[in-house]
Amino acid sequence: MYPHLTGLGIHDPSQIERYSLRQEAHKDVLKIYFHKQKGEFFAKSVKFKYPRQVKNVLVDSGSHQYKEVTEINRNLTLVIDELNKITKPPKQEDVDIKQKILTDLKHLEKVVASKIAEIEADLEKLK
């Protein structure tokens, strides 16, 4: 069910409580924390380091200047997706889509009316 976590040696993903992710130099450090067991003072954790992928990105096409940028490792994104499924509860769609659209439309009407009034006031100043 969680092939990437299993690949990291985590055979019981239900024990995962949370995780943290930080960047150190040219590496991303993923730390996974497990639920504290009876009799333990601290929760067990494991740490994994992933090298950042380096890419050259065209900055200015006229002068053909490139800039070296780093981005998160693809394998790490797959692991994080699995961790999010475990640690973050599924979102509840509380807002009715039709109601949200109507609310957004009313807000847009107010914004447009306000902008029209502002432009008309500016026109009056020019007379």
Swiss-Prot record:
**Highest taxon above the source species:** Bacteria
Enumerate the InterPro entries for this protein.
UPF0325
Pfam families the UniProt entry points to: DUF3461 (PF11944)
Please give the family membership noted in the entry. Answer: Belongs to the UPF0325 family.
Spell out the HAMAP family in the cross-references: UPF0325
Spell out the protein name for this chain: UPF0325 protein VV2560
Look up and give the organism this protein is from.
Vibrio vulnificus (strain YJ016)
